[in-house]
Regions:
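C-terminal alpha-helical cap/extension of soluble enzyme domains
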Residues: 71-72, 82-154
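Alpha/beta enzyme core
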Residues: 1-52, 63-68, 72-80, 84, ...
Length: 154
């Protein structure tokens, strides 16, 4: 049997889900990716009511962490993720699992890069992993409460 179904509605793995050419510029000059295919999600939900739906590659690629990575020696130009509002909408429809690993890796990598830039003499993992863990914890808290809508539902 099948326990859950991962459908393709416009997400993809990694930090480069969309090219700048696929996006539009908003009033603030920020690239906005195309909308997810909610029509496909709604059709699958109609045909398989109550069936667990999964979204792979659904990181929002927080720009504050992309900027942190880039500021402290990384090179991630054009990293664009799925807007959190769209992920929230997917969670409100039928999606029960949304994979956001790239967001966590960005938070950890950016924080560690910043730590080493500010403390080049340090080498103890207990020191540089402490702020990285704190940022990941805060990011997960934000996602659970504000994006995924699953805080307190364990």
């Amino acid at each position: 049997g099948c326990d859950s179904l991962a459908i393709a509605i416009g997400t993809s793995h990694g930090a480069y889900k969309f090219t700048p050419e696929q996006c539009t510029l908003n009033e603030q000059g920020i690239l906005v990716p195309p909308a997810l295919r909610f029509d496909v999600l709604e059709e699958v939900t109609k045909r398989l009511p109550g069936f667990p739906i999964v979204l792979h590659g659904s990181s929002s690629v927080p720009q504050e962490y992309v900027e942190m990575v880039n500021t402290y020696g990384g090179a991630m130009p054009g990293a664009i993720g799925v807007p959190e509002e769209q992920l929230r909408h997917a969670a409100e429809l039928a999606v029960c699992k949304i994979n956001i690993d790239s967001d966590l890796r960005l938070a950890m990598t950016g924080t560690i890069r910043k730590f080493f830039a500010e403390h080049p003499d340090k080498f103890d993992p207990r020191e540089y992993l402490k702020p990285a863990r704190a940022n990941i914890k805060e990011l997960v808290r934000h996602k659970l409460i504000n994006v995924l809508g699953c805080a307190g539902k364990a």
